[in-house]
Amino acid sequence: MELRDNLACALKHLRYLDKKRRLWVDALCINQSDDIEREFQVSRMDRVYISAVRVIVWLGPGSESTQLAVSTLSHLGRQIEVSRWGSMPSPSCAEPSWYHTGSVLPYNDQAWRAIYEFINVSWFERLWVIQEIQLANSNSVVLCGAHEISWRLLHRSLLCLSMKRAIIPENIMQCILKSLSLTLPSREQTLQTSLYQSRFALCSKPVDKIYGILGISPPRFVRQLVPDYRAYYGEAYKTAFLEHAKIVCRFELFGWCSLSQPVMKMPTWVPNFSKVCAPFPLQNRGICYASGFSRCHYSYKPGKVLNVLGLRIATVAAVSQSAIESFTDLFNIFNFIQVEENKNNRYGTGQPLLDAIASTLSCCFLSERFPSMGTSVLSLEELKNAIMTHLGSVIKDKVVEQKLKSLMLHVEGRRLFTTKEGLMGLCQDCALPGK
């Protein structure tokens, strides 16, 4: 049997010298070239990992810096506790302030380099490992050469680092953000959230964007989806969309629909789950759709047409040229709606135009609406001042920059549109003038 170098290296490190050891390795225990066998195994993958005595993650043989990375991350993981609602100091911690987003970690360049080398490996980018480690029990460990760290401690340390975006080296933060799908509690999330969190994860087949997270998907959805590797992946995407809509009675997955990145040979309403630029699900932060959380009404018969009931309230007049991906794009939006020239004008609802712009671009994620967030989010006045102060210029205030980064999470991948009725909103690339 042929083995890839990494697997051969792992087996040599994992074997006992004096007794037999029983391991389950998907690359060996599943015939990857047999689609029928893969379909059967995919549907029971969750039971395999839930039933395991423990899951062992193999990162590779390691390097000279591995020991420093493991000791640094282990110590960091011992300082915090993590729950569904955030992080807090561990009862036995030696550094009670490290959990806080603004707390600077006393690491030198050597330590940061060791951490980067440790997490900058392919395992953290793979799609299938998300459900494997999410379904694993608390005994699970991560091995890198001869060095070991419990997944519990690594999970906590990565979450702690991810919350310090303003003070973590950029190269490390990029690696951490790609690994967030491993550390966030996907088993308790909606399908929409799991798809969003895993959007950067890599897989060999487009259909695995769905099949690869079935183990952590809502049971009602999983029961309706039968893995089929012999069919065109677009059919799996369509089935996933329709079955999910039937269960939740909302079109939550429309965020993956795209005219610029459509699923070939499929209707434009079929989401493209293989694209990585899907926008952030706004309801994750208590932000509603334009229609609130009202039920959708639709009908579908086999074919290409999806009949949807809606209300015609406005006509699109213009759409910003490109999606918002950076602060530069955000400033281009301000030019698109001529903020400087119209800052004293009134919006279609009667409120000041600048208030409407700030509310739209923040999706109303402001301290006035979420007072429990305190100073971690901008107020309407702070955002308006930031817009006018930094219009087309470099943001020098680190506090303002950090808060604007939080705002960017809502608008990334979206475009601004205006209507003939004098209104504005955020949309996908499928909104066209005249619609």
How would you label these PLM feature ranges?
Residues 22, 40, 47, 62-435:
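Acidic/Ser/Thr/Pro-rich low-complexity tail/linker regions in eukaryotic proteins
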Residues 1-81:
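Chitinase-like catalytic core of GlcNAc-active glycosidases
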